[in-house]
Amino acid sequence: MTHLKDLPLHTLQFYATAPYPCSYLPGRQARSQVATPSHLIHNNAYSELVTQGFRRSGMFTYRPYCDGCQACVPLRVPVSTFQPDRSQRRAWKRHQKLLVSSLKLCFLPEHYQLYLRYQNSRHAGGGMDHDSIDQYTQFLLQSRVNSRLVEFRECLPNGEAGALKMISILDVLEDGISAVYTFYEPEDQAGYGNYSVLWQIEQARQLGLPFVYLGYWIAQSPKMNYKLGFRPNEILQNGQWIASSTAKAISHE
């Protein structure tokens, strides 16, 4: 892990939180390293922080800082070398007719209702399935960086936009796109999540940005392990981005 003294952002301060229950690995305690003050973390600073393994949740910019555990590994996909596998190509082809709109962060009841359906289906009992409007807004719709809310809608026979199928929140950084959060209609075998990542990779390519940052890969968490399937990819290890295929074994203890 990069030490505080090595961070180039001298105007910011960094502190460690108290331990709290890990959201990904049952029975574990987690801690975060938090960057403050939030009003100084605009797009340039945040882009630099992301390359150091930070993420954001609303105005909260953090990275894992756990005692004796390195299970959360930052992962990014180099756009120029990405090669989709067979299932990813199927997901891309299947959803080509979705109508896509990129919006500023905004609250719409339709979005919130989709969020609740997604949480109740995919993460029931995790707490987020009962998020209030205020919690949803603080989590996804507050940002000081270059953020976008992307709608994916069914295309009706007349070419007009129909039912809302998916929402992706993303940040456009200096060197890439950072995938913040995606939620979608909980349809079996639809592959919306894979399509969202593929769409962001293509969007980064069109914008001339070299990377898509997918957050943390956690080998022991099935909900997070899928990220390794977007290959080739790079992970942040000992302060350096390296190809995951050549990385040394990572300790999860």
UniProtKB/Swiss-Prot annotation:
Single Gene Ontology MF annotation: arginyl-tRNA--protein transferase activity
Annotated EC: 2.3.2.29
InterPro entries, sorted: Acyl_CoA_acyltransferase, Asp_Glu_LeuTrfase, N-end_Aminoacyl_Trfase, N-end_Aminoacyl_Trfase_C, N-end_Aminoacyl_Trfase_N
Alphabetically ordered keywords of this record: Acyltransferase, Cytoplasm, Transferase
One example of a Gene Ontology biological process annotation: ubiquitin-dependent protein catabolic process via the N-end rule pathway
Record-linked HAMAP family: Bpt
Function (record text): Functions in the N-end rule pathway of protein degradation where it conjugates Leu from its aminoacyl-tRNA to the N-termini of proteins containing an N-terminal aspartate or glutamate.
UniProt-recorded name of the protein: Aspartate/glutamate leucyltransferase
Organism: Polaromonas naphthalenivorans (strain CJ2)
